Amino acid sequence: MSMTRQEIQDLCVKSLEEKMVGTTDKGIANGNGFYQYFFTNFPDLRVYFKGAEKFTAEDVKKSERFDKQGQRILLACHLIANVFTNEEVFKAYVRETINRHRIYKMDPALWMAFFTVFTGYLESTGSLNDQQKAAWMALGKEFNAECQVHLKNSNLPYVH
């Protein structure tokens, strides 16, 4: 099933209604919960979190660092979902995200892999249906495509 940019945006935004950012306990827990899920289900990727390579979900839950990091990742997801219909702004945000992450020397394949992780998190909390998952993966495909173009144009490793 092919979806329009507007349909993708609407479905992604809807999937985030229960995953709002914010300073309330629930808002903080939403973001921290992503990293609890991440550290439990993708332990091999902990290497990208200097000083937290051996963290468990319980360590993450008690970590102010991941309270803040969780807010950043959720905010980023809200932003890309909400600007998806504005293709130039979406692409600019993708490029800016790459620029901020250059120092971590991430495997370029991880940009698409993120959306598998993120949709897995949403599914694990009951916040995602099949249509919304398809929308996130479609958004992720476009996100990744712009990532790879920008990585290539920046003379950085990219997925061919």
Curated annotation (Swiss-Prot):
PROSITE patterns cross-referenced by the UniProt entry: GLOBIN
Which keywords annotate this record? Cytoplasm, Heme, Iron, Metal-binding, Oxygen transport, Transport
Keyword Metal-binding in annotation: yes
Q: Which residues bind heme?
A: 101
Every Globin domain range: 2-152
What GO cellular-component annotations does this UniProt entry give? cytoplasm
**Pfam families in the record:** Globin (PF00042)
**Between which residues do disulfide bridges form?**
none
Q: Where does this one sit in the cell?
A: Cytoplasm
Gene3D superfamilies on file: Globins
The protein's predominant localisation is cytoplasm
Q: Which GO terms describe its molecular function?
A: heme binding; iron ion binding; oxygen binding; oxygen carrier activity
> Record's SUPFAM superfamilies?
Globin-like
Which intervals of the chain form a coiled coil?
none
Q: What family does this belong to?
A: Belongs to the globin family.
Q: What does this protein do?
A: May be a globin and may play a role in oxygen transport.
Q: What is this protein called?
A: Globin-like protein
Upper taxonomic classification of the species? Eukaryota, Metazoa, Ecdysozoa, Nematoda, Chromadorea
